[in-house]
Amino acid sequence: MAENEQKKSYLYQYRTHVRRINRIEAELDEIRAMKMHPSVVNDGMPHGYGQNDLSGYASSLDGLERELLHERYLRITSYMDISRRIKRLRSERERDVLFYRYIKGMDWWEIADRMGYCERHIHRYHGKALAHLELPKDVMECQWGK
């Protein structure tokens, strides 16, 4: 993997954690909604499939809540590390481009609009920022087998 691709992959970690958190929260909402509004079959026949048993419900909620807590922890540690590395860049424009792209998740045109430049300039700043960004040694060793 090329060095710039490796850096992009590293920077995208934060957005990946944000997406996972959103998905887990949506799953929790769905499970809670299903429990609050169970489907009812009005066919006049008795149904004995344990609607009063909350252990499965509680277990699935507990598992997802633990996963959510862990993912939030990973998001925070990822944010702290990535933002610290971005802040080490000398150029404020390079810092802005990386922050807006990889922390805020903005598209190129949104970054250009926010910073008052054309997209071509934003891509140039992005390339320079990636060249100046330093990755942790363990990431480089893991990816490149050094």
Show which residues each predicted segment covers:
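The short coil/loop that forms the "turn" connecting the two helices of the helix-turn-helix
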Residues: 116-117
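N-terminal interaction/assembly modules
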Residues: 1-87, 110, 135-146
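Short amphipathic alpha helix immediately N-terminal
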Residues: 89-104
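DNA major-groove recognition helices of helix-turn-helix
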Residues: 82, 122-136
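N-terminal positioning helix adjacent to the helix-turn-helix/winged-helix DNA-binding module
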Residues: 78-81, 92-94, 125
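Hydrophobic positions on the alpha-helical face of helix-turn-helix-like DNA-binding modules
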Residues: 98, 111-112
